[in-house]
């Protein structure tokens, strides 16, 4: 394992993960890399997706007490319809003025299906308490959702639950990332678009890292974005949830993740506003009287919680542009800073000599 602090910082801010599995931040900080190595069932129609999800839920039920992480979105609402009456569900609720409250819609789905419903309240204090243990297990800074999932997993464990069920990867597998799929992107355009933080504004040694995207550059020079998401982002996103559940001693189950779209994604439909068209069809069949809910990310009100945060910063981080970042971008810088200060230290850490960085910016 190569010790490469500079690469790992750049990789995390760009992709929220260390993309080279032979590198680590520093000695003793071996990263935990997640790979979801399961057989994936090809799905062509809403009927096939329905049958697949029913089978997956039945398999989960055979392995002990389960609960569903239920949001206001289609993906978990569909899963709720397959669960036996009385099954426990949990909804995350961040206590911040700017946070979307999904509890009402989630409660409606729970009531429709005769399920128990519990709200897991999330506060900034939870981040102060749980972020560093999650980073320590992972050997890397974390995604902000990991703290929320970890608290929910602890709650579920106290309730006697063995496995938490998530709707994760439905967006990746069925065309939910409509903004990324909205147009064609060249390699350089997509590298800039996908990067979560502009490393030139944060790091003293910024690098351009394109290795996860390069295998998906097509002969015409454009990036196969759907292929990139199914390949790279699939494992990265599942890793967020798995790290949190594993630290809590909770089983993780994602029924969508063992499927794959069995035919080319209809980009024209996506670009006309019909994202996740197979999931839309299935949702409307299960809940014919309900409108298609708007796509919303899991709530994480970092714009409020980190509104005034500016440090103190580790020496490798630059302060000038932090105030202009979005809440989510501030989280990634904050998390990297916490990781560096706690696990790397502010003195006697290895930095490259001038000109030694790979692909410097």
Identify the meaning behind each predicted range.
Residues 59, 64-113, 118:
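ATP-dependent adenylation/pyrophosphate-handling site
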Residues 60-64, 156-162:
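Glycine-rich phosphate-binding loop signature in dinucleotide/nucleotide-binding domains
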Residues 164, 169-187, 227-324, 351-360:
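Mid-to-C-terminal catalytic subdomains of enzymes
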Residues 75-79, 99, 126-128, 172-176, ...:
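Short catalytic/ligand-binding loop motif for oxyanion handling, primarily in non-cytosolic enzymes
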Residues 5-18, 151-154, 228-243, 329-346:
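Short, hydrophobic/amphipathic alpha-helical patches that form generic packing surfaces
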Residues 103, 107-137, 163-168, 205-212:
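A conserved beta-strand->alpha-helix junction
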Residues 183-215:
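Short, flexible loop segments at boundaries between secondary-structure elements
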Residues 1-65, 345-361:
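RNA-binding accessory domains that recognize and position tRNA/RNA substrates
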